[in-house]
Amino acid sequence: MVKCTIEGYPKGSDITILNTSYIREKKDDDDGSSAYVDYLFILFKDNKTGEKHYCIKNSPSYTYYMVKNGGKLKHHFMFIEEDELEPYTCPYSKLLYDIATKNNFKEWFYNNIRMNNFAGNRQLHTLNHVFYSDIDIEDYYRALFAERYTNEPCKLNKAYLDIEVDGRNRMGEFPESGECPINAISFLNDENNTSYQFILEDKTAPNYNMIQEYKKYINSQNGINELKQFITNTVGGYKKANKYEIDKLQYKFLFYEDEAAMIYDLFQLMRELSPDILLIWNMAFDLSYIRDRIDKLGYNPLDFICDDSIPVKFFRFYVDERNKNEFAERGDFVSVSSYTVWLDQMIQFASRRKGRGQYVSFKLDDIGKEIAGVRKLDYSNITTDIMQLPYLNFKIFSWYNVMDTIVQKCIEAKTQDVEYVTTKSLINNTRLSKAHRQSVYLANRFRKEFKQKGFIMGNNVNIWNEKPTEKYPGAMVGDPTHNSGEPMIKLPTGQSIFVADNVIDYDYKSLYPSITIENNMAPNTQRGKLYIDTQVHDKEHWDMYTSDEETAKYSRAGEMLENMMSGNHIEFCHRWLNLGNIKEVLDDMIELYRATSIKPNVGVKILPFKNVHGIEPMLEYDGMIKGVTFDTEYSDKDKLLSEVRKKAFI
């Protein structure tokens, strides 16, 4: 069994995981040969000292399970008792090979490799008797870390970054990534309440003299005082500046004639200050541009971005091009050998609010205005082209760049999105890049809680199934005003299900978990789908669905189940089981009791029956049954009527 042990930290130590990065790369040997190596980089924080440390797991191990004694299962199990399984441990990079070897699929495994069908080997996870083998290695070690250490949410130090590009010599309408110089970088660090700006003073640029004048001005106390007052006014006055702690900020301006030195010093400062989280709004632009610009200047981005104190160097930046314009779905992430975790602030904002109503725009200016009441600096009285601004008014250009990170800070102060995503990642044992993805974090949460109860979750086999062409019909509709303030149902676990007053809950969504628990609904409790091919009665509702979707077709079996759950048992049996309706049932009852009555010639009057959808309650009718003596427990006509009403109409 694999354990996540960290040297110097015994079980129960108060440390919290910050990030995980699994790296697999090809290494060239001195003799000209090459081989793949893999390792897991774990960044964590000591909550007692506040210091951050790392742990590197070379060729990390992984434990999966199979049914004991070579047992085979006839179908997929959602979960199974851990006592019925045998654990198997192997290097994670050899996981599929190990499963194939132990299940006599070795030749098939190599055939897939020869055919470049590497994804085909992942179907080994669908073997019914194989469990717990399809977890992402980063999530797997997050779970192991949480089992051994406290892993509680901790205080996080945040920083913000924004760059500006000098696009005057661009070839197209907008600079290509890395094409033009970076002429300003704003870096705001929360922990020491300091805003840093790195400014490029290009001697060949037409605005060089303007920059020199600004340099002299901004390095004076008068310049700093004017900047502070300007920032206070821009965010909305002293109250708002105090609310977002903008009034506490100090400002430092650093000027460089060499662009490469400027970028290098930025990362050196980041290493020195070591924020826990670095937030960039639309990181796909800023970080990609920095990386490509370093390369354009003739340097290796690893030498700039990675921390020299860490023995391994890696920098992976994934941009989700498939969801490029769907910000709430974007899966951009950074893996870097650093003591700082990089996050896209825009994606975190959009992902957290997915489904709550679409924002008109996710631009920094629009979100800053709507969330925090703070906007970017408006330079429209000078120019409409940001590329021209540093040549027309360099002071406003510089302050515009500084103001961007201040807007970022105000948004985060208002939303606390970083605390949300990191806490969600911790409690669900899920990597930060997938913390908002329900299909990922819910599966990890299931694994965590089921394992605590002695069960091991099965693998997700649905990813290999074809998408269903039709939907399961069904709905639950109710009037919340009919519910009291008392618990509707008390579950065996002792948990109560409430419906609260003064709560807007469209489509009764809050009841879904309660309904699921009450009825024991889960993949492992499903036994099939009911089909009724031929018409059973003449009252079928072909228009029972309001959806125009092709998949929402009429289901005879669905209507039958809905009728059965309505509680109108007599009408259900009449329609679907060809039994008597209410009139016929009463006729049979009267005929039975008449035949068994002690007194002959009993006079009976029957309430006229009206066959309607959703039978109306039976009205009181004094002359309905007269002079009947029964040899049954219903010797009293009122008692009989009461029982009929009780059992026939719910």
What residue ranges belong to the model's regions?
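The two-metal-ion catalytic cores of nucleic-acid processing enzymes
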Residues: 1-493, 497-504, 508-509, 513-647
